[in-house]
Amino acid sequence: MHILKKPDLSDPKMRAKLAKGMGHNYYGEPAWPNDLLYIFPVVILGTIACIVGLAVLDPAMLADKADPFATPLEILPEWYLYPVFQILRVVPNKLLGIALQTLVPLGLMLVPFIESFNKFQNPFRRPVAMTVFLFGTVTTIYLGIGAALPIDKSLTLGLF
């Protein structure tokens, strides 16, 4: 079974249709009823079966019960807040930490305007956007790993 069904461009009937402007909607396999009635339910049921199977085979364990008289030394936020928590924890001036928090979304809003002259959609042909994306990804991972470590090892990640 082929994943992509390519049109036969050597067929004179197909070339005549394409010359009239009849595009991809006039050849190939129709979405109704083939995809919507047969393929989508199989994918949905397979996804549900995988989720239920993983939940049954490896259930999530509950953590220790809360003890109000024994608080941990350092309370960490949820994992997705680790990078911003690390910024607030490392920056000495808290106002500067809040300002850095506002610079992140402002910087993300500027990215489309930086490279608006580039007509390519291929990420490898958009060097500015790729550089900003890779720098942001590496910085976020670095800050996230550092937030999980104690404060004295958080900047060097315990390597130095």
UniProtKB/Swiss-Prot annotation:
Keyword Transmembrane: yes
Domain of life: Bacteria
Keyword annotations of the record: Electron transport, Membrane, Photosynthesis, Thylakoid, Transmembrane, Transmembrane helix, Transport
Primary location group: membrane
Keyword Transport in record: yes
Record field: transmembrane: 36-56, 95-115, 131-151
GO terms of molecular function: electron transporter, transferring electrons within cytochrome b6/f complex of photosystem II activity; electron transporter, transferring electrons within the cyclic electron transport pathway of photosynthesis activity; ubiquinol-cytochrome-c reductase activity
Localization in the cell: Cellular thylakoid membrane
GO cellular component terms given for this protein: plasma membrane-derived thylakoid membrane
Topology in membrane: Multi-pass membrane protein
BP terms from Gene Ontology: photosynthetic electron transport chain
InterPro entries referenced in this protein's UniProt entry, alphabetically: Cyt_b/b6_C, Cyt_b/b6_C_sf, Cyt_b6/f_cplx_suIV, Cytochrome_b_C_euk/bac
Function (record text): Component of the cytochrome b6-f complex, which mediates electron transfer between photosystem II (PSII) and photosystem I (PSI), cyclic electron flow around PSI, and state transitions.
NCBIfam families: cytb6_f_IV (TIGR01156)
Family in the record: Belongs to the cytochrome b family. PetD subfamily.
Subunit structure: The 4 large subunits of the cytochrome b6-f complex are cytochrome b6, subunit IV (17 kDa polypeptide, PetD), cytochrome f and the Rieske protein, while the 4 small subunits are PetG, PetL, PetM and PetN. The complex functions as a dimer.
Designated name of the protein: Cytochrome b6-f complex subunit 4
Native source organism of the sequence: Parasynechococcus marenigrum (strain WH8102)
